[in-house]
């Protein structure tokens, strides 16, 4: 889990996600939550679950993704991503506000919600003992977040994209 101002995950080279869970919350203008640099580098996604939320100034998307949105989300709000059957893929309470977010998973049909009530979710341990990041279970209620078009749409798109 990365919570930073500036470039939260700054590879300045090719960045690859192969598995596991990655949660990134970034704040600060002129930067983005994922940054692979500008020299023909790319962000490649081939597995796991990745959520990156932050400033839209230098927002880059991985080679493929399941959900992209330019809906603003305030600090302290919870975003939850579900598969087509309503199962929670990942949930993240944002420590920083977000102007844009991307979510990568092996699912091709993903819905995002803010708020709602989670049940049966497993949370990752954190130093401050908050249930900030987790997976599994179900969600009831919540407000659906609109997906944005542009850039790559769904698994199999390009890389090092700044969609807007």
Regions found by a protein language model. Name each.
Residues 1-164:
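A composition-driven surface/loop motif
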């Amino acid at each position: 889990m990365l919570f930073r101002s500036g470039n939260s995950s700054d590879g300045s080279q090719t960045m690859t996600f192969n598995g596991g869970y990655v949660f990134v919350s970034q704040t600060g203008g002129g930067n983005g939550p994922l940054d692979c640099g500008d020299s023909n580098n790319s962000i490649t996604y081939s597995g796991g679950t990745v959520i990156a939320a932050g400033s839209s100034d230098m927002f880059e998307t991985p080679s493929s993704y399941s959900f992209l949105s330019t809906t603003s989300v305030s600090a302290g709000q919870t975003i939850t991503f579900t598969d087509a059957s309503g199962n929670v893929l990942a949930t993240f309470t944002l420590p920083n506000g977000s102007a844009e977010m991307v979510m990568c998973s092996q699912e091709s049909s993903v819905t995002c919600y803010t708020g709602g009530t989670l049940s049966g979710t497993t949370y990752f341990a954190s130093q401050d003992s908050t249930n900030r990041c987790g997976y599994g279970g179900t969600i009831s209620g919540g407000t659906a977040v609109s997906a944005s078009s542009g850039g790559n749409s769904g698994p199999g798109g390009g890389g090092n994209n700044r969609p807007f």
